[in-house]
Amino acid sequence: MIDVNNFHYMKIGLASPEKIRSWSFGEVKKPETINYRTLKPEKDGLFCERIFGPTKDWECSCGKYKRVRYKGMVCDRCGVEVTKSKVRRERMGHIELAAPVSHIWYFKGIPSRMGLLLDMSPRALEEVIYFASYVVVDPGPTGLEKKTLLSEAEFRDYYDKYPGQFVAKMGAEGIKDLLEEIDLDEELKLLRDELESATGQRLTRAIKRLEVVESFRNSGNKPSWMILDVLPIIPPEIRPMVQLDGGRFATSDLNDLYRRVINRNNRLKRLLDLGAPGIIVQNEKRMLQEAVDALIDNGRRGRPVTGPGNRPLKSLSHMLKGKQGRFRQNLLGKRVDYSGRSVIAVGPSLKMYQCGLPKEMALELFKPFVMKELVQREIATNIKNAKSKIERMDDEVWDVLEEVIREHPVLLNRAPTLHRLGIQAFEPTLVEGRAIRLHPLVTTAYNADFDGDQMAVHVPLSKEAQAEARMLMLAAQNILNPKDGKPVVTPSQDMVLGNYYLTLERKDAVNTGAIFNNTNEVLKAYANGFVHLHTRIGVHASSFNNPTFTEEQNKKILATSVGKIIFNEIIPDSFAYINEPTQENLERKTPNRYFIDPTTLGEGGLKEYFENEELIEPFNKKFLGNIIAEVFNRFSITDTSMMLDRMKDLGFKFSSKAGITVGVADIVVLPDKQQILDEHEKLVDRITKQFNRGLITEEERYNAVVEIWTDAKDQIQGELMQSLDKTNPIFMMSDSGARGNASNFTQLAGMRGLMAAPSGKIIELPITSSFREGLTVLEYFISTHGARKGLADTALKTADSGYLTRRLVDVAQDVIVREEDCGTDRGLLVSDIKEGTEMIEPFIERIEGRYSKETIRHPETDEVIIRPDELITPEIAKKITDAGIEQMYIRSAFTCNARHGVCEKCYGKNLATGEKVEVGEAVGTIAAQSIGEPGTQLTMRTFHTGGVAGSDITQGLPRIQEIFEARNPKGQAVITEIEGVVEDIKLAKDRQQEIVVKGANETRSYLASGTSRIIVEIGQPVQRGEVLTEGSIEPKNYLSVAGLNATESYLLKEVQKVYRMQGVEIDDKHVEVMVRQMLRKVRIIEAGDTKLLPGSLVDIHNFTDANREAFKHRKRPATAKPVLLGITKASLETESFLSAASFQETTRVLTDAAIKGKRDDLLGLKENVIIGKLIPAGTGMRRYSDVKYEKTAKPVAEVESQTEVTE
């Protein structure tokens, strides 16, 4: 076998008959499979041992030679070679066909490759191949054209006139003769000449034919190989036949299909030997052709061959296709050994990097390691003995197991794995029971909950794999989310509630205003019940030893609460004392107003001071996230994970102490709710009256009513939130960010509000009751629509989002950081992304973590803030925006010159680590996951906008798909193709509007539909590509009008718009990587003197290479225009045929690749996974594996001789 890691590329092509025979170990002559009595394979049949090898290791068929010592012998009785039975997985056979047959892929695919090569229509080909017409191969003196079709009658006429003087044939033989006569060089010349003169349809056909002829010429495939004389038979173990327990047999469909081919082939041979009449032979040949078609691609032509129960049989093509095919089922998604799965339970006592592994599961997973250790410790005498000890679960096994799993990380994975945080490494600890214990803080990353979710465990076996798991995948290392660089391990639910409760302050708490010497005194007082957690107290500031306090402050008393003192103990010492949830307090220092000079206090002491002070807000979920981010910025990952663990412990402890529950009494009904409802009811009556008088349209009435009731709900919600007590448990839950929000509460205590009908339209009758009061039957019925729609939408959305992620990953999987600096001279101009007045993404967020492309100076002081190719840190970004600079050029993936992938400088910092990105990082996959993972949070619906009929703007997930597939958007905007001034806006016929733009040289008029809103005014100057009406721009058209840079920026802005409106933050660089992949190709307009074909899609780098070559030799360069491909199309157009074939349209991709003789250089990730190599990312990159090292240390003996021996 070939060593997987030692080959550099994979090439595919057509197989010649000689090649097929050279693969084969013998000809299969009989359709028999196995003998039903002896269950041995039949000789010369489809499972023959003489051809394919023995069924039992080291044993021939008749049993004369048994044992490994006869290795390689061929038995003289039965002719079977004595070898391993594994060869039955790799040895092929063949069938010598009695008549040539065409290969359905090349004849039936679109476009038909045979048809293009012969310049015949697929229909004509079909008539010939399936014996309906004759084709003229050699016209002789008949005056017929070559390749003319003749019907049976016409052929008879000519044959009577010119007996034996001309040649016309039927079936694949005729086609084969024509293919053998093709002179590729001659065809090429003719086609190149035709390109010069032809136009329209003839030109496109010539280009297509040229492509096929070029492919055959360059690949060394002979056209006649598209016709099969010999049919290969795949190894028997790949199309097995197994006995079921009822004595019946289950067999692969391929065996049935092969049997039909062999039967028909043998019958044809017999008929030919007998010299049967032509018509019978023809019929048999046609049946053979159909049998081979069914074997290669069943159902491609005519009705599929069916098995029992009318089920179409699975042919060779179906074995490769689709989710269950060879590519996706077995090559890209293998099941692995040393893995297990179980239900997860929460493990609150675990450290950040630990997980609990059930004992019996761990024992099974680490079995070989335990066995080795048992033998080494001489607890067991040999491996067999060790194995039985493990199976009996003897007591001594457990101690050894604990030893073995120490420091041996395992990987935990939860499906669906939407982003890279769906697989993380943990150090296992043994737990009782059968559930895997998971650390509560990593649940966010996995999107897991403990209501019965299951997780899979995988054991990294090699030392290298263990090292990678520990260094790169350990849960404590993965604190930041790769999509936006924010912490992903923020506490949730109980932990948030606990910390919120801890930092609450109450006016009426016991002993408010007590003053303590130091924190120990406070804790003692709290333990003895002298103060409560919420008591506001004073503590001598000097006792904190806080480095951020000034000398002045240290002489004063710090006003704080007991809970905050406990909370601050988990914060690192160098931080300011956190007394209020503000960035100022967190990042700089504790506000001075909390330091009180004891001499200034009045009679009532500190208590009096507190009575006049407002309560400080407690710390909610968002602020806890900010604390984590700040700790991460200032300290190592280890410190952060330790602090997280302490924060988790605090949260659980105090949420338990708080004992927060929800009862019916906590849901306070609003007293003046009825009054609000009555007021709005009157407004609705007024609108209805206006409508009845014909003052407003139905549309306006409906929108007004909906608006009135929405306003009613908002008013009730506002008043409810005002009337709530700050210590109300439901309020605390929603305010802290633990669970629920204002809207949930309004539905419980206020009113449910407006509901959507199944169509998505809002029903104008609101539900005025709340859940506390109970709904009427009608209200309940209306609300079921919404509930059902919600569930249906969620299910559809999940599938859609998953498919989007798959397409994104496929198009960007080969984008890897491959070099430090590509040396580009271009940059991307960035500024705020705004929609009207609404800010979508601020300038500061766009530049942080990127490399500058220009020198930025302070406009006033002229000092240099940053030079080109320097990283913009958060501090520098703040300096730039503070200086009033609103736009700048940065390095971007859009302008990166790297041939494959991107370079470090154009990408910027790695968001998952906060450091600069390293060569080998698979940034394409990360980008795809970052865009795809939040897909489930986006809405499905297209919004029905109020007021304007028929202008539905697509939003949410469908809009993202529309952008990445480069489709024509719904609600398309009109753009101007020239620069100039808007001269006139007038009504045109059919209620359309006409916008006239006058340029320097020409005037253009554009038609917009009557309902679309025009956003330009008469006299307004417009640029090329500027929008004239509201809506989305069609990106392909925009590319030709406004150019490459504008299109890139537009697509980036549109994607960000959708995500940010849903409150999802994604870094620009991910979108840039994806959009770059969509714009990798150019379409050749004129070929010049290069070898490129006009009209073909070429990679931008191949295009520039070809032109560079042309300039070098003073020849005419080619011209081309950029093309925007949707992600599906871009994936299929990739250079790698393995990647494309495993994505979609497998047969089409492989057909094309075989004819072109394509070679796959295995640059991407998928290709390498398919053939089983290490992927070329991370440590698998060649630059890391080709490191040579030499020993520089001196030999031990030499060192020892130089050291003095001391006692």
UniProtKB/Swiss-Prot annotation:
Cellular component terms (Gene Ontology): DNA-directed RNA polymerase complex
Cofactor note: Binds 1 Mg(2+) ion per subunit.
Binding site for Zn(2+) 2: 822, 896, 903, 906
Catalytic activity: RNA(n) + a ribonucleoside 5'-triphosphate = RNA(n+1) + diphosphate
Keyword Aminoacyl-tRNA synthetase listed: no
Residues binding Zn(2+) 1: 60, 62, 75, 78
InterPro entries referenced in this protein's UniProt entry, alphabetically: DNA-dir_RpoC_beta_prime (IPR045867), DNA-dir_RpoC_beta_prime_bact (IPR012754), RNA_pol_asu (IPR000722), RNA_pol_N (IPR006592), RNA_pol_Rpb1_1 (IPR007080), RNA_pol_Rpb1_3 (IPR007066), RNA_pol_Rpb1_3_sf (IPR042102), RNA_pol_Rpb1_4 (IPR007083)
Stored SUPFAM superfamilies: beta and beta-prime subunits of DNA dependent RNA-polymerase
BP GO annotations: DNA-templated transcription
UniProt GO molecular function: DNA binding; DNA-directed RNA polymerase activity; magnesium ion binding; zinc ion binding
UniProt keyword annotations, A-Z: DNA-directed RNA polymerase, Magnesium, Metal-binding, Nucleotidyltransferase, Transcription, Transferase, Zinc
Pfam families attached to this UniProt entry: RNA_pol_Rpb1_1, RNA_pol_Rpb1_2, RNA_pol_Rpb1_3, RNA_pol_Rpb1_4, RNA_pol_Rpb1_5
Residues reported in the UniProt entry to bind Mg(2+): 449, 451, 453
Gene3D superfamilies in the cross-refs: 1.10.132.30, 1.10.150.390, 1.10.1790.20, 1.10.40.90, 2.40.40.20, 2.40.50.100, RNA polymerase II, clamp domain, RNA polymerase Rpb1, domain 3
Enzyme Commission code: 2.7.7.6
Cofactor: Mg(2+); Zn(2+)
Similarity annotation: Belongs to the RNA polymerase beta' chain family.
NCBIfam families, per database record: rpoC_TIGR (TIGR02386)
Subunit organization: The RNAP catalytic core consists of 2 alpha, 1 beta, 1 beta' and 1 omega subunit. When a sigma factor is associated with the core the holoenzyme is formed, which can initiate transcription.
Function in brief: DNA-dependent RNA polymerase catalyzes the transcription of DNA into RNA using the four ribonucleoside triphosphates as substrates.
Protein name from the UniProt record: DNA-directed RNA polymerase subunit beta'
Lineage summary: Bacteria, Bacillati, Bacillota, Bacilli, Bacillales
Gene that this sequence comes from: rpoC
